[in-house]
Amino acid sequence: LTSLQNPEKSKNKVPSGSVNRESGLWSLIRQGMKSSGRSIETTRLESWAVPGVPDVLLCAESGRFSFLELKVVRDGSRKLALSAHQCAWLSRHAGSPSFVVVRDRSLAISVFDGAAAVDLRMDGFSAVAPLAVFEEPYDWEEFLKLTCPL
């Protein structure tokens, strides 16, 4: 099996059992940040406090903030499980550096503009053009230039 067919053989290791969860995607992104050499402050947000707020707040070295909503697609579905609260938050903050980051079954990471949340929920991510798609080995510097600009 190739690394794309078997997450256990992937060069981008995440904790065992979490490859198909948002926490596994977050672990992978954190590892990428460390390897990039950037000094990005991160906060994993608790959605129970304010429904719909994205999963991660990033603060670039310049002090600029951005938000990441993390999603992992486990099956063949192309629609994302974005809640009405998440769509509302991302729509209200359209124009801000807010992103929906999706890891699919092939382990590719697609980055979408947060303003596309409603379309992603209703029509699926095959109907919305991503800002970028990152395949293994991931180019974390480019990923961070997009999602956490200076």
Feature names for model-found ranges:
Residues 73-93:
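Mg2+/Mn2+-dependent nuclease catalytic core
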Residues 1-47, 61, 150:
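Acidic-basic catalytic patches of nuclease active cores, encompassing PD-(D/E)XK
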Residues 52:
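Beta-rich catalytic cores
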Residues 91-118:
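Nucleic-acid nuclease catalytic cores
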Residues 43, 68, 99-101:
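Hydrophobic/aromatic beta-strand patches that form the interior of the parallel beta-sheet core
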Residues 2, 6-13, 127-150:
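Charged phosphate-binding loop/patch that engages nucleotide di/tri-phosphates or the phosphate backbone
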Residues 80, 116-123:
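Sequence/structural signature of beta-propeller domains
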Residues 56-58, 64-75:
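Conserved catalytic cores of phosphodiester-cleaving nucleases, focusing on short active-site segments
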